[in-house]
From Swiss-Prot:
Its main location: cytoplasm. It comes from Salmonella typhimurium (strain LT2 / SGSC1412 / ATCC 700720). PANTHER family: URIDINE KINASE. This is Pantothenate kinase. The gene is coaA. Keywords: ATP-binding, Coenzyme A biosynthesis, Cytoplasm, Kinase, Nucleotide-binding, Transferase. One of its GO terms (molecular function) is ATP binding. It is found in: Cytoplasm.
């Protein structure tokens, strides 16, 4: 079978970095280097070049999709003779722990909000929809944080369902990585944004991923465009360990940190601890629950060293 025939059999169009960068067209750079520095994660190199070559073409594509969706809504309103409610366009971002989902989400939020249309863009992470630690302890799930059974899926589905139904004000719980728990009574109100970016491990999952909790509607049913941030497993492990070491010298030194004891570890002890956490929890979750959802995404971004995207696959 020829390469051309093989490419016809995949549901994705494939682009290397230079091919994808060319699709930026004439979209202007709207972020400064200082702003980009504020958007990047603790363990990531995010350059002006990366934003220009990867994220500007992606924001251009998303702007086309969002405009098309608005035209479709207008057609329906014209047909029904109604003035429709403001229904947000939902973009989901999935991928492994430490792959850089949060940075991708923040960069897209910044870029999409600066298009000439001045759309309002909200960012919500699914961490807030984890069951509180007290519930996880009662169910013996503290070492399963991030696994499907650790989430209040009914609340998460209701959140996105209400947004798509035009409910004016919808609340989302907020998670604190400092205390490693959902903040009691710390809900955030989301008031009919034009775009919602939903970032988390579980946003591409469907019924087959929740055999323990059968229900018929899932987050993915309400998502308009989904992104999976991918990277080789050996890089993910390295990034996870490096991030842990930086937290050990930073966030973990806070006496209020749930992981304050880790700040006292030697570097060797910290590397061993992070490696165990990766293998026993995060790698397992990746293999069992996250990676199997990759091919459900509208777009797959594959990273190489230094968090640089080397390939983009776009669903036809």
């Amino acid at each position: 079978m020829s390469i051309k025939e093989q490419s016809l059999m995949t549901p994705y169009l494939q682009f290397d970095r230079s091919q994808w960068a060319a699709l930026r067209d004439s979209v202007p750079m709207t972020l400064t280097e200082d702003e980009i520095a504020q958007l990047k994660g603790i363990n990531e190199d995010l350059s002006l070049e990366e934003v220009a070559e990867i994220y500007l073409p992606l924001s251009r594509l998303l702007n086309f999709y969002i405009s098309s969706n608005l035209r479709r809504q207008a057609v329906l309103e014209q047909f029904l003779g109604t003035n429709g409610q403001r229904i947000p366009y939902i973009i989901s971002i999935a991928g492994s722990v430490a792959v850089g989902k949060s940075t991708t989400a923040r960069v897209l939020q910044a870029l999409l909000s600066r298009w000439p249309e001045h759309r309002r863009v909200e960012l919500i992470t699914t961490d807030g929809f984890l069951h509180p630690n007290q519930v996880l302890k009662e169910r013996g799930l503290m070492k399963k944080k991030g696994f499907p059974e650790s989430y209040d899926m009914h609340r998460l589905v209701k959140f996105v369902s209400d947004l798509k139904s035009g409910v004016p004000n919808v609340t989302a719980p907020v998670y604190s990585h400092l205390i490693y728990d959902v903040i009691p009574e710390g809900d955030k109100t989301v008031a009919q944004p034009d775009i919602l970016i939903l970032e988390g491990l579980n946003v591409l999952q469907s019924g087959m991923d929740y055999p323990h909790d059968p229900h018929h509607v899932f987050v993915s049913d309400f998502v308009d465009f989904s992104i999976y941030v991918d990277a080789p497993e050996e890089l993910l492990q390295t990034w996870y360990i490096n991030r842990f070491l930086k937290f050990r010298e930073g966030a973990f030194t806070d006496p209020d940190s749930y992981f304050h004891n880790y700040a006292k570890l030697s570097k060797e002890e910290a590397v061993n601890t992070a490696t165990s956490l990766w293998k026993e929890i995060n790698w397992l979750n990746l293999k069992q629950n996250i990676l199997p959802t990759r091919e459900r995404a509208s777009l797959i971004m594959t990273k190489s060293a230094n968090h640089a995207v080397e390939q983009v696959r776009l669903r036809k």
